[in-house]
A protein has these predicted regions:
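Glycine-rich nucleotide/cofactor/substrate-binding loop typically near the N-terminus or early
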Residues: 60-69
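C-terminal alpha-helical cap/extension of soluble enzyme domains
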Residues: 170-243
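N-terminal amphipathic alpha-helix/helix-capping segment at the start of soluble metabolic enzymes
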Residues: 1-9, 13, 49-50
Length: 243
């Protein structure tokens, strides 16, 4: 089997560079990890594109919460896709549902069309759909190159059987990329069990603040943050290469 592709979800430019150093094949850049991810700033995308030597995909998501978007949010996402094209990104990561949990094909077709020559990944809005096999056919019809999914479960490990069924259903018409809860201990088993040849992980670690001064009155405002760990990325890569 061909070498399995490792995509790292990176919540900052620093995380993206760490992922590259660790051996990632591709970056998904986003902001607001704690809220499931939103579109990163123009500056973050621009600097990431300048610094990275590997493919850069950008999450297009106007806000946290559900995946049912209003016209204003759609306008914002279309503008963000235009910026990604302007900055030379390799792909965008999109997704939208209607109120009944079906793929919002009208909006998604606009997003895919706006992406033009860029590759398109349908994100984990897919896992929130009411009928995953039906949703997969809709995503394929949109012309997306891949779908990121945990098989509708809390983790790709828990959804491995569904992922395997989706891979079989796809019949090479689209790449089913496994993601959610993957680490160096389970990624090889998930890859082997599902047949997924693209895998998505965050490889995140806590970054402690270097501040010596801290105001204890600011309850809930932690000075620490989360970054991608290059060592964990390397461990993920090694685990996949050992299959």
């Amino acid at each position: 089997m061909a070498r399995r592709l490792l995509e790292i979800a990176s919540n900052s430019v620093a995380s993206a560079l760490a992922a590259q150093a660790g051996g990632a094949d591709r970056i998904e850049l986003f902001d607001n990890l704690a809220e499931g991810g939103t579109t990163p700033s123009y500056g973050s995308i621009a600097v990431a594109r300048e610094r990275l030597r590997i493919p850069l995909f950008v999450l297009i998501r106007a806000r946290p919460g559900d995946f049912h978007y209003e016209a204003l949010e759609a306008e914002i996402m279309l503008r963000d896709i235009a910026h990604c094209r302007q900055l030379g990104c390799d792909g965008v990561v999109i997704g939208a549902l209607d109120a009944d949990g079906n793929v919002d094909t009208a909006l998604c077709q606009r997003l895919v069309s706006a992406a033009g020559p860029l590759q398109v990944t349908f994100h984990r809005a897919f896992d929130a759909a009411r009928d995953l096999p039906a949703a997969l056919e809709q995503v394929i019809a949109l012309g997306c190159q891949r779908v990121l999914t945990s098989g509708g479960k809390a983790s790709a490990e828990a959804g491995a059987d569904t992922l395997a069924a989706l891979v079989a259903q796809s019949n090479a018409r689209i790449s089913v990329m496994a993601g959610a809860g993957l680490n160096a201990r389970n990624i090889a088993a998930v890859a082997a069990r599902t047949g997924c040849v693209e895998l998505h992980a965050s490889a995140k670690a806590a970054q402690c603040s270097a501040m010596r001064h801290h105001n204890p009155a600011l309850v809930g405002l932690s000075p620490d943050w989360t970054v991608t760990d290059a060592g964990e990325v390397a461990a993920l890569r090694a685990a996949l290469d050992a299959i």
